[in-house]
Amino acid sequence: MMTAHRKSNGDTTNFARRHIGPSARDVAAMLETVGAKSVDALMAETLPASIRQAAPLDLGKPLSETEAIAHMGELAAQNQVFTSLIGQGYSGTILPAVIQRNILENPAWYTAYTPYQPEISQGRLEALFNFQTMICDLTGLDVANASLLDEATAAAEAMALAERHSRVEAKAFFVDKDVHPQTLAVMRTRAEPLGWNLIVGDPLTDLDKADVLGALLQYPGSSGALRDLRPAIAALKAKGALAIVAADLLALTLLASPGELGADIAIGSAQRFGVPMGYGGPHAAYMAVRDALKRSLPGRIVGLSVDSRGMPAYRLALQTREQHIRREKATSNICTAQVLLAVIAAMYAVYHGPEGLSQIARQVHRRAAVLAAGLRKLGFAPHSDSFFDTLSVDAGAKRAEIVARAAAEKINLGVGETALRIALDETTTPATVEAVWRAFGGQLAYAELDATTREALPEALKRTTAFLTHPVFHAHRSETEMLRYMRKLSDRDLALDRAMIPLGSCTMKLNATTEMMPLTWPEFGSLHPFAPREQAKGYHALFARLEKWLCDITGYDAISLQPNSGAQGEYAGLLAIRGYHAARGEAHRKICLIPSSAHGTNPASAAMVGMDVVVVACEKNGDVDVNDLRAKADKHANDLAAIMITYPSTHGVFEEHIREICDIVHGHGGQVYLDGANLNAQVGLSRPGDYGADVSHLNLHKTFCIPHGGGGPGMGPIGVKAHLAPFLPGHPATRGDAPVGPVSAAPFGSASILTISYIYILMMGGEGLKRATEIAILNANYIAARLDAHFPVLYKNARGRVAHECIVDPRALKTTSGVTVDDIAKRLIDYGFHAPTMSFPVPGTLMIEPTESESKAELDRFCDAMIAIRKEIGEVEAGRFKIEASPLRHAPHTVHDIADDAWARAYSRAEGCFPDGVSRTDKYWSPVGRVDNVYGDRNLVCSCPPVSDYAEAAE
């Protein structure tokens, strides 16, 4: 059958032609290699007939790139960009153009993956190290992570950390009544399944009588009130409870740090450091802890180690505490975080430095103080005389009139239950302040009040300690220096703009430029997530259409766009299942069946919702052992809540008996959670909702083109069948009465990056999406066919096919040569490639996923590199040299290696540095040699040393 892709080879306006790598000629050659008569025949041999989608995917006529941009302009025009002074953790900010163009809009940064291969990730690892340093300095604590999903999620994670470490046995946690409402709501969602009681009150008056394991205190408060929290923290310490402070980073440039106040943990958002509000995200949250808590810190941590030459090198530290290793015993289910946004925030600090940040903070505070003086003059005294940037006032009967007058000035005020809130930010001008006064009925001149107004920061809370003392925060004031610094870092990394990233289970496909363009338009970027809905009509039209498309693609009946990552989608999906059982009077159903091959987030997510994990065995061919499943479903029939299963399986194969698996679970009262991580092998060919699944998360940063950003942002919306729809996550701003609370701070998660997936589907259309799936499967089978004789493909279906990825097995070579999977991964760097996924789901193997976006030429380059590496292993087997002396063990080779005066190795410089097929003119050089992971964890360094350390070292 002639497809749209085949017909469009000469059509320059057809986006699918640009997105899909292989040409029609390539496809024909690849089919010959894999031994299939046609793409349709290959699909018939790969997918079980029982799950094939009957009707074609009808998503409307696909648009060209030009038409799509015009359409997005029409949607953008429906959004109204007001000056939002709403606050609640979201602020207007100015993203320096040099950072916007060279980080946010630069594929060298946004197409990279999580830095599991540290040697080729040194640039973004250094940027994240700067982020951690910035957080540690501002919070006054010892160790920070490399970002979390949002402030509310960070608060929930901190509460869980406190529960593990508190000396108090009570399962109660205190929450400051002046926290952001969305933070409290997310914490309630997290606490309820685990049986934790939240006590909300005033920490300065109510803590003494509360038996709690810890407390979250907002600094400054959501109302703007600035309180000395030291008495509350001292009271917590006396109980053996942990003190968590949610702190505003910009305010901390002027205020005493949480560490100085005695806090154990600090959390918050880095959004106002240059990251647009984006109608809710994405933004980088942070968490910092005192040293004793570092091994329980959730999320990624970047540490400093050394490479094979003893030179400094960055790496991800303390990974043994993470979900992919500890599974249901992990500190968190966090996987994807917000790396790209953390990098932007760190670069904002690098560019401005401590003096610039302090100047911005003083300006914001000054304008808030002048605003307060004017409001007092007009008869509206702020609730607190001490504040940083936010004021709360009672307006009485004039409230609605004031809000309306502000709206006429294109200003949004924060509207609380009884008070109005006015939160200023970096973008606030004197004209903005005067407009607010007019809304309150006054005609005042900013300059007159500015001359007589005093600041409102209490002397006892003023910052006296230095911050950002490391030279990196002082050396890049000019745009020239900043530009070169960012370029230097990006040159150290290997991202999709250089080469294929064949990571299995990660779907590193094209992130097309057209898809990325609207992201930075102010009509999408400058909207506050709690702005009136009528100001976001374009967004809501996009949400509605995207939700319908995703339902059509998956066979589900309803979608929630709220989850900010795949792991958070798992959490939301399991909460929906839990809510469904509870509503039916079956809250006792808490057993979650999980195959032994599952991704580590699955058991970690199940534990977070209070479920007990029971592992189901897998057969030798990688399939779920149906007999073991049936036996365990029988055993736990009265308590079975769900099964979590990935499809196609994590072994890279479509299991034939997926319908039977779903039927067994349903027959025993359970629900089927189908992990959507591998949906890129199904779109247009099969729909989870049709063959028995009840709920899935959909990785928009995999299947639907949101870039991975070096480790985030991601999005994991969930699709559900109709019976689970009432249990989708609610939110105080939209569905406050929903039976299941929110999982994210914003009601639509990271709304601004939904534009990327929307445009992708808009331009591909149903036939284009189906073709993308077919080519993804063809590409994987082509790699399997080329490599099978050199590295056996571990799992295939009964017809010898793999799905969209394959696992190759070099384990036998360790016996014959001593080579490890790590040696192969590092040697691939010398060939210019990121390694495939290592040791998952089978230790000692490599899982390869090429995606549909890679051309045959790039697939061949990768296969040639793997085959050349197999020949090098053969030389070790033949005794030419021992593995310790081989180029495999010394990989990756650096410029320092080739420049050595003496070359005392058993192979030539050319063999080591320019292996077969590697160009000498445009070779990628790893900036460091193989990183010493053991040294890094034994000598943990997670932030830049202060400048005083350099002085002491010199002495």
From Swiss-Prot:
EC annotation from Swiss-Prot or TrEMBL: 1.4.4.2
One GO CC term, this protein: cytosol
Q: Which cofactor does it need?
A: pyridoxal 5'-phosphate
Residues modified as N6-(pyridoxal phosphate)lysine are: K702
Q: What class of enzyme is it?
A: oxidoreductase
CDD domains registered for this protein in UniProt: GDC-P
The molecular function terms in GO held by this entry are: glycine binding; glycine dehydrogenase (decarboxylating) activity; pyridoxal phosphate binding
Alphabetized InterPro entries for the sequence: GcvP, GDC-P_C, GDC-P_N, GDC_P, PyrdxlP-dep_Trfase, PyrdxlP-dep_Trfase_major, PyrdxlP-dep_Trfase_small
Q: SUPFAM superfamilies under this entry?
A: PLP-dependent transferases
One BP term from GO:
glycine decarboxylation via glycine cleavage system
Q: Which UniProt keywords apply?
A: Oxidoreductase, Pyridoxal phosphate
Reactions catalysed, as given in the entry: N(6)-[(R)-lipoyl]-L-lysyl-[glycine-cleavage complex H protein] + glycine + H(+) = N(6)-[(R)-S(8)-aminomethyldihydrolipoyl]-L-lysyl-[glycine-cleavage complex H protein] + CO2
Q: Of which family is this protein a member?
A: Belongs to the GcvP family.
Job of this protein: The glycine cleavage system catalyzes the degradation of glycine. The P protein binds the alpha-amino group of glycine through its pyridoxal phosphate cofactor; CO(2) is released and the remaining methylamine moiety is then transferred to the lipoamide cofactor of the H protein.
The annotated subunit structure for this chain is: The glycine cleavage system is composed of four proteins: P, T, L and H.
Name of the protein this chain belongs to: Glycine dehydrogenase (decarboxylating)
Q: Which organism is it from?
A: Bradyrhizobium diazoefficiens (strain JCM 10833 / BCRC 13528 / IAM 13628 / NBRC 14792 / USDA 110)
Biological classification of the source: Bacteria, Pseudomonadati, Pseudomonadota, Alphaproteobacteria, Hyphomicrobiales
Gene of this entry: gcvP
